[in-house]
Design a protein with these regions (language model features):
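Conserved alpha/beta-hydrolase "acid-adjacent" motif
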Residues: 95-101
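Hydrophobic "lid"/C-terminal helical patch
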Residues: 34, 67, 105, 132-136, ...
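Short beta-strand/loop motif that positions the catalytic acidic residue
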Residues: 82, 88-90, 94
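Active-site nucleophile loop of the alpha/beta-hydrolase fold
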Residues: 1-7
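Cofactor-binding loop segments of dinucleotide-utilizing enzymes, especially the Rossmann-like FAD-
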Residues: 2, 91-92, 119
Length: 145
C-alpha cells in the first residue's frame, strides 16, 4: 500500500520534517504525531494504539532509514509494468496521500480499479473494516470493485 512517489506532495509534513521530529522528540512521540493523521478520529480512533505499538517495535535508526528511503523513492515509471488486476483504495480524508497521487496510480496502472471510501483517512482497513473487507473480497472473487 503505497503511492507512486515517496516525497508526497501536500503530505501533512515533509519527510525532512518527520526526520527532524524523530530526532527532536523521539520515536514514540513522532509515531503518535504521524499515526494521528491516519485516522479521522486521530488518537481517539479505536485502532490508534495498535499503530503506536507497531511503531515501538522499531528503532530511531530504522525509522530514519525508512524515511530516507521513502524520500528518494519514485515508482511512477514502473506502474505501467503492473499487469495484474489492481485494486486501488483511498480514504477521501487521507493526509498522507492526496488525490493527485491516487489519480497517478489509476492513470498509470493498466487494468486498475479505484474505490474511494468516504469519511476515512489513511487507514481505511481499520476505520471501515467491514466495508473494506467486502470490497477486497469482491475484487478477489470477481476482479471488480
Amino acid at each position: 500500500s503505497t503511492g507512486p512517489m515517496g516525497e508526497m506532495p501536500n503530505r501533512f509534513e515533509t519527510i525532512d520534517e518527520s526526520r527532524s521530529n524523530l530526532k527532536k522528540i523521539g520515536l514514540e512521540a513522532t509515531a503518535r504525531n504521524i499515526a494521528k493523521t491516519w485516522f479521522i478520529l486521530g488518537d481517539k480512533a479505536k485502532y490508534f494504539d495498535i499503530c503506536i505499538q507497531a511503531g515501538k517495535e522499531t528503532s530511531i535508526e530504522a525509522a530514519d532509514n525508512a524515511l530516507i528511503a521513502i524520500k528518494k523513492w519514485n515508482g511512477i515509471d514502473n506502474l505501467e509494468l503492473i499487469k495484474n488486476k489492481t485494486l486501488i483504495i483511498w480514504g477521501d480524508k487521507d493526509k498522507s496521500y492526496n488525490f493527485e497521487q491516487v489519480q497517478t496510480l489509476k492513470k498509470n496502472i493498466p487494468n486498475s480499479s479505484l474505490v474511494i471510501f468516504k469519511g476515512c483517512a489513511h487507514n481505511v482497513h481499520l476505520e471501515k473494516n467491514e466495508e473494506f473487507n467486502k470490497t477486497v473480497l469482491n475484487f478477489l472473487r470477481n476482479g471488480t470493485k
